[in-house]
Curated annotation (Swiss-Prot):
UniProt keyword annotation of Cytoplasm present: no
Keyword DNA repair included in the entry's annotation: no
Pathway stated in the Swiss-Prot or TrEMBL entry: Bacterial outer membrane biogenesis; LPS lipid A biosynthesis
GO biological process, one term: lipid A biosynthetic process
Protein name in the entry: UDP-3-O-acylglucosamine N-acyltransferase
Keywords, ordered alphabetically: Acyltransferase, Lipid A biosynthesis, Lipid biosynthesis, Lipid metabolism, Repeat, Transferase
Molecular functions (GO terms): N-acyltransferase activity
């Protein structure tokens, strides 16, 4: 389905520079777009690609359009440009692109008919809204509540007493254990597990060394998981239930694939967590934080609002102040890394040599005096 720029602006705002009747039927990168496609410029370092793109129209920020016009003597198509170009001018082209992309997906995806697949297992004591879509081999246990417009894809498991908020979509093989609350419009991707037991074991050992006897005693995890509205949880991510109170994921948190969130954590609203990050139990992360991929955060620490942890960093203490924090060693040439590692191994010896030199110099200074 093709839409004019005028129709897009009526839906999403912005201003048109060029032909308002230009039609686009999809999106593509600047260097690959054709005349029927909409591209976007989110990073000014790619401004030169706007000059050569074949896109029918480009989403662009006002300041970047000014730079472009300055580079092309104010003309809509300068000497280096592929042809006349149309623009939708908006303060945030990237977010505008995301909304248009979702619109095209929605237009191209026929709505699924509500109902329960014959192979699904729904406990008689569960409540399932008539507008919900329940796919093949889904299990919904007693006391669970499936609200309006929820989609549960194949093999989804919903435990007893759990609530899935209106408009949520759970992809195949996602599992939400008992006693959890999923807010409205959640997206939970394939293989995610919400509400599995937290990692809690009490040591019960006596003796030392080879004479040590006893075992680890499992601590029942009687809390649940509360997920706020508009949260997205990536594939194969696990969020443990609380030991006594709930683990809490606040509104509009976005969690990537294969992230581990331990029991009793609280993740503040609008925080984003990239893939393979691990957050140990009883940690609190503030609002609008950004956690890089494969970062590790120790248990019982607090991160303040607007904290950014870069990829592969390890956090072992609380960071209450907003800012960017790094502890990862960046990739360097292999030989250079080996030389640096050798220096690190010898730091103790180097320190002792420096101390000895300082002592000798001090003694020499005393003799000269």
């Amino acid at each position: 389905m093709a839409l004019t720029l005028e129709e897009l602006v009526k839906r999403f705002g912005g201003e048109i520079a060029g032909d308002a009747q230009c039609k686009v039927s999809g999106l593509a990168p600047l260097d690959q777009a054709g005349p029927q496609q909409l591209a976007f410029l989110a990073n000014p370092k790619y401004l030169s690609q706007v000059e050569t793109t074949r896109a029918g129209a480009v989403l662009i920020a006002p300041k970047d359009l000014e730079k472009l016009r300055a580079a092309t003597d104010g003309q809509p198509a300068g000497p280096r440009m592929a042809g006349p170009l149309n623009f939708i001018v908006t303060p945030n082209p990237y977010a505008y692109f995301a909304r248009v992309a979702q619109m095209f997906i929605d237009l191209a995806t026929p709505p699924r008919a509500p109902g329960v697949h014959p192979s699904a297992t729904i406990d008689p004591a569960a409540q399932v809204a008539a507008s919900a879509v329940i796919g093949p081999h889904v299990t919904v246990e007693a006391g669970a509540v499936i609200e309006d417009g929820v989609q549960l894809d194949a093999n989804v498991f919903i435990g007893r007493g759990t609530t899935i908020g209106a408009g949520s979509h759970l992809y195949p093989n996602a599992s939400v254990y008992h006693g959890c609350k999923i807010g409205p419009r959640a997206i939970i991707h394939a293989g995610a597990v919400i509400g599995s037991d937290g990692f809690g074991f009490a040591p019960d050992f006596v003796g030392d060394g080879d004479a040590r006897t006893g075992s680890w005693v499992k601590i029942p995890q009687v809390g649940g998981v509360t997920v706020g509205p508009d949260v997205e949880i990536g594939a194969n991510t696990t969020i443990d239930r609380g030991a006594m109170a709930d683990t809490v994921i606040d509104e509009c948190v976005k969690i990537d694939n294969q992230v581990q969130i331990g029991h009793n954590c609280r993740i503040g609203a609008y925080t984003v967590i990239a893939g393979s990050a691990g957050i140990a139990g009883s940690t609190t992360i503030g609002r609008h934080c950004m956690i890089g991929g494969a970062a590790g955060i120790a248990g019982h620490v607090t991160l303040g609002d607007y904290v950014i942890i870069t990829a592969k960093s390890g956090v072992s203490k609380s960071l209450p102040k907003a800012g960017i924090y790094t502890s990862a060693f960046p990739a360097v040439d292999h030989g250079e890394w080996n030389r640096s590692a050798a220096l690190v191994r010898n730091l103790d010896k180097l320190r002792e040599r420096i101390k000895a030199l300082e002592t000798a110099l001090a003694a020499q200074g005393g003799t000269d005096a």
